[in-house]
Amino acid sequence: MEAIGAAITKNNSGYDSFCLTNAKNNNIKVSDSDPLNWGVAAEAMKGSHLDEVKRMVDEYRKPVVRLGGETLTISQVAAIAAHDHGVKVELSESARAGVKASSDWVMESMNKGTDSYGVTTVHGATSHRRTKQGGALQKELIRFLNAGIFGNGSESTHTLPHTATRAAMLVRINTLLQGYSGIRFEILEAITKLINNNVTPCLLRGTITASGDLVPLSYIAGLLTGRPNSKAHGPSGEILNAREAFQSAGINDGFFELQPKEGLALVNGTAVGSGLASIVLFEANILAVLSEVLSAIFAEVMQGKPEFTDHLTHKLKHHPGQIEAAAIMEHILDGSAYVKAAKKLHEMDPLQKPKQDRYALRTSPQWLGPLIEVIRFSTKSIEREINSVNDNPLIDVSRNKALHGGNFQGTPIGVSMDNTRLALASIGKLLFAQFSELVNDFYNNGLPSNLSASRNPSLDYGFKGSEIAMASYCSELQYLANPVTTHVQSAEQHNQDVNSLGLISSRKTYEAIEILQLMSSTFLIALCQAIDLRHLEENLKNSVKNMVSHVAKRTLTTGINGELHPSRFCEKDLLRVVDREHVFSYIDDPCSATYPLMQKLRQVLVDHALVNGESEKNLNTSIFQKIATFEDELKTLLPKEVESARGAYENGNTTISNKIKECRSYPLYKFVREELGTSLLTGEKVISPGEECDKLFTAICQGKIIDPLLECLGDWNGAPLPIS
């Protein structure tokens, strides 16, 4: 072997690294100041979560992913996974020499008679057996690992999603590029062609992610070697056999005859679990930010008190996730037209609602903060995993030896995915609690029950069905929060007696992501409904005030002979009643004697009459005598005025514009209403809540919500407002 050179370098985090370099181009980085890598891990957590999400989105949208083995990100994996995204993979040419060196070492060592696991020995618990037929051993490895069941159809529940397969191929290439696995560079180029030409092998379940994801990865190897049972999906979704797949991908040199160690290099890694985990975490980070903004919008439409976001409260708790969540909500609420209006309302009648908002609103930063920390830590853990060398044995060319270890154990995946799934379930629980308050007229500060918007609430039950659906989603999400990693079974003749279940946990977390997307879309549609109802409420209240004022002036100002009447002083108190009374508690029949408006207006007149004293005995100055006249005229005019205001609202000709346009949350509302073409739901229309939620769910799944979401936070400077 050739001599080892040494060099001091700076790694990405600024730490001094001592690099052992050999002529075969293998680099082993060991930091003098951070030998255990804790510093690098901590460095990766610096800065805000939102900035990190923005970087993810930027990376996701780049047209090329350049693989070198050490800089792959979860957003790049997610981008490649979305096969219609148009992102291409390029391999770093500088990695070729290192890959070739490890491949050559395997062949040289075998020719010398060196005994190496998986090269001259059989696999797993039967590694006591030896063979000199290295190529035949690789072929048998792929054959016996093809143990999955396709079932009926090409896209059965036993076949992994195309996105997961594409992610797995990308991650496996990245691992093998580092030159510790003993595989030819040409095989990595072939897998790259499959990705770039949208040819996706069909992978089956059946892995415990302990000796890597053996069974699913064996189907990639099976396609590369031309096994007759191999299947792939072509660019248009058509089913291809191995030969057709190679033709479609432009691989012209025929199927590969695997050399010693190459089959093991392909299958003995964590790429399927970590690839799917990367997809999951990209979505989880987006949903985490969305939950923060949704909580702020919830505070707006619920007329919440913004002091729950005050920086001092969260500074005293110390947790960075909580501090950032509160700062983001504070930014959304700062200057909000809803917050300003709610402040006036609270000042006018401080007893109208509880002194403190309920927990789903008031403690939302404390609830979401730790969950965001979990998701962020899991993101970094998986990012380390997809840049790791995770097969066995590892070929250390510089020391002329094969290292037998256990980097294939996917515990970082299983643990990260279990933790992420628990965080997703807790986010879902918060959204459900907020949704339940929003649709309940006992809690929602004047909004109608079930957010129904029709003229006749007896024939409109709004989001009642949606609340039932939300309960279903939340229950399933909480069930999925149960850990996978506690269900380990000893496998492979007790050789794999502890195993990570990484892919299983990733699959369950993938399910959890979809459910949280269902919940987020349903909740945001409901929030937009509430925003529109607040707009309708404001216009209806304005019309009621104008009519009450008009009727009061006509009937209460003067007496029979035109003289000023004591009842003229009632108008101010009558208007105060209108201001304080929730519009939707009476608006379907505003002059009904059983509804609070007419009762309280009459009570104002009665109270004034009681203090009118001796003047009540005189018909010309009696306020009691005016009550019937006032009520009769109001009953004649008010219903017509209310209907006129409703008509103006429906035609887009409102007197008062929608407050949401003055709020930082407006981009999300605008996206839902204008770009997706949703509208206020009523029992008078045919369209159902589910149809509107479906539009938003599809948009969320397609990533279309990202831009309006980030636009809401576009001018946030990354810090809380100063404590004043």
Curated annotation (Swiss-Prot):
Keywords: Cytoplasm, Lyase, Phenylalanine catabolism, Phenylpropanoid metabolism. It comes from Pisum sativum (Garden pea). GO terms for cellular component: cytoplasm. The keyword Cytoplasm applies. It catalyses: L-phenylalanine = (E)-cinnamate + NH4(+). Belongs to the PAL/histidase family. (E)-cinnamate binds at N268, Q356, R362, N392, K464, E492, N495. InterPro entries: Aromatic_Lyase (IPR001106), Fumarase/histidase_N (IPR024083), L-Aspartase-like (IPR008948), Phe/His_NH3-lyase_AS (IPR022313), Phe_NH3-lyase (IPR005922), Phe_NH3-lyase_shielding_dom_sf (IPR023144). The active site is at Y117. This is a key enzyme of plant metabolism catalyzing the first reaction in the biosynthesis from L-phenylalanine of a wide variety of natural products based on the phenylpropane skeleton. Pfam families: Lyase_aromatic. GO terms for biological process: cinnamic acid biosynthetic process; L-phenylalanine catabolic process. Pathway: Phenylpropanoid metabolism; trans-cinnamate biosynthesis; trans-cinnamate from L-phenylalanine: step 1/1. GO terms for molecular function: phenylalanine ammonia-lyase activity. It comes from the Eukaryota. Its EC number is 4.3.1.24. The modification 2,3-didehydroalanine (Ser) is found at S211. This is Phenylalanine ammonia-lyase 2.
